Amino acid sequence: MGKPTSSGCDWRRFLRNHWLLLSTVAAVVLGIVVGVLVRGHSELSNLDKFYFAFPGEILMRMLKLVILPLIISSMITGVAALDSNVSGKIGLRAVVYYFSTTVIAVILGIVLVVSIKPGVTQKVNEINRTGKTPEVSTVDAMLDLIRNMFPENLVQACFQQYKTKREEVKPASDPGGNQTEVSVTTAMTTMSENKTKEYKIVGLYSDGINVLGLIIFCLVFGLVIGKMGEKGQILVDFFNALSDATMKIVQIIMCYMPIGILFLIAGKIIEVEDWEIFRKLGLYMATVLSGLAIHSLVVLPLIYFIVVRKNPFRFALGMAQALLTALMISSSSATLPVTFRCAEEKNHVDKRITRFVLPVGATINMDGTALYEAVAAVFIAQLNGMDLSIGQIITISITATAASIGAAGVPQAGLVTMVIVLSAVGLPAEDVTLIIAVDWLLDRFRTMVNVLGDAFGTGIVEKLSKKELEQVDVSSEVNIVNPFALEPTILDNEDSDTKKSYVNGGFSVDKSDTISFTQTSQF
């Protein structure tokens, strides 16, 4: 008698395990179809477009809701679960990986844009400008980055970031607006038309989570409670429970994800007004997308394979849900809950690694953004007929790397840092408006590359930290089996029937006493 076929069972198991991924892919395809049909057969007002995208807005709000508790709980528990020396080694390996891949991405982008030359055949006046240029000073932006690493108010850091703005000092004192000046300092003077302009620095707070400041605090807080022993264990247990509860909420949110993604992609297709710009900037877009494809399909998998010696594409397949989410919502921070779930449940990466590495990676590891900024800067130089020297190309490389590390994981942060890169080599900052029209699409693909780089980083750091993690496991098992190693020793005196001595830092009291101490006393 032959074996009963199990193909039906396997098919059902496959659907049960991958229904969310399949439904998300179907939602993307359906969203494109719906967007094209609605755009072609009806004229929607701006108000109608806003209402149409409402279900997608709800998805974004739900994902952003869990970012704060997830980052705080995961960072604290991840650091507290490890020895400070182990945490330092893991952190160093993660930073080296992030920096190395970012530098490789920048070099790759520059090689491609110099070879393809997408801006040589076009002129600046042939491309329509869109939007307005962000007002950014390189020095002020870098100082703001350092300031935000050390927030003065922890509660405020959960919903606001510090930002400075330059204001021209007018001869007559004319206080305007309701803005509160946090600090006022004479910044600089410039000569324009033989007139001296004086500026002052005004400190403001803008909406948005200060992720970098929270990560620094959680890192220190986790190290401290990890060294407190039993006194800090109650806090470790609390944040562990908070992390687990947050991940349960993420599972509920992901059930709604296909619906939200459908309306997100359809709403964006309906919203775009000028599709002609895609033809004009087609070669530039092809250069950026080619660089992102090479980095994500060749460079990152090759590094993973060399270090881990496993199939990188199987690992990437396990991250498919997170990559699709990043592609649709274009925010690595908002994708973080899904990235956690895929890395831990699909690829079985150690939670001590994911909780420590992923929040940091979502903040400072921006391979796709760095590549995009390098390509865009050289492209704008080509549009202006400017021949870049080796020194200027090196300047672009360094600035793009530094700016991408400082960019927050929020939509279109690349445009803000793009101004810094352009200013570093003397290119007109207003030319960033030439590429804004297509940035919404490129932003999605570079965010996907950013998330993929974070994911590969967890696998690589886990492999390199295997020995330290095993040592932590062994020491934990010893403590769990016999944490205090108490063995009563009879005192050699007349009261030996009722008294016991200190052994290994613990002590026992006479059985006739009401309370019996069985744990080590800490002095």
Swiss-Prot record:
Compartments, record wording: Cell membrane; Apical cell membrane; Synapse, Synaptosome; Early endosome membrane
- Residues annotated as transmembrane: 19-38, 62-82, 94-114, 205-228, 238-265, 286-307, 353-379, 440-461
Q: Where are residues bearing Phosphoserine located in the sequence?
A: 516, 521
InterPro entries with a match to the protein in the record: DAACS, Na-dicarboxylate_symporter, Na-dicarboxylate_symporter_CS, Na:dicarbo_symporter_sf
- What keywords sit in the KW lines? Amino-acid transport, Cell membrane, Chloride, Endosome, Glycoprotein, Membrane, Metal-binding, Phosphoprotein, Potassium, Sodium, Symport, Synapse, Synaptosome, Transmembrane, Transmembrane helix, Transport
Q: How does it sit in the membrane?
A: Multi-pass membrane protein
Q: Does the keyword Cell membrane apply?
A: yes
A Gene Ontology cellular component where this protein is annotated is:
dendritic spine
Intramembrane parts of the chain: 313-343, 393-426
Residues reported in the UniProt entry to bind L-aspartate: 330, 332, 369, 410, 446-447, 450
Cytoplasmic compartment ranges equal 1-18, 83-93, 229-237, 308-312, 344-352, 462-523
Provide the catalytic activity annotation: K(+)(in) + L-glutamate(out) + 3 Na(+)(out) + H(+)(out) = K(+)(out) + L-glutamate(in) + 3 Na(+)(in) + H(+)(in); K(+)(in) + L-aspartate(out) + 3 Na(+)(out) + H(+)(out) = K(+)(out) + L-aspartate(in) + 3 Na(+)(in) + H(+)(in); D-aspartate(out) + K(+)(in) + 3 Na(+)(out) + H(+)(out) = D-aspartate(in) + K(+)(out) + 3 Na(+)(in) + H(+)(in); K(+)(in) + L-cysteine(out) + 3 Na(+)(out) + H(+)(out) = K(+)(out) + L-cysteine(in) + 3 Na(+)(in) + H(+)(in)
* Written domain comment of the UniProt record: Contains eight transmembrane regions plus two helical hairpins that dip into the membrane. These helical hairpin structures play an important role in the transport process. The first enters the membrane from the cytoplasmic side, the second one from the extracellular side. During the transport cycle, the regions involved in amino acid transport, and especially the helical hairpins, move vertically by about 15-18 Angstroms, alternating between exposure to the aqueous phase and reinsertion in the lipid bilayer. In contrast, the regions involved in trimerization do not move.
Q: What is this protein called?
A: Excitatory amino acid transporter 3
Q: Which organism is it from?
A: Rattus norvegicus
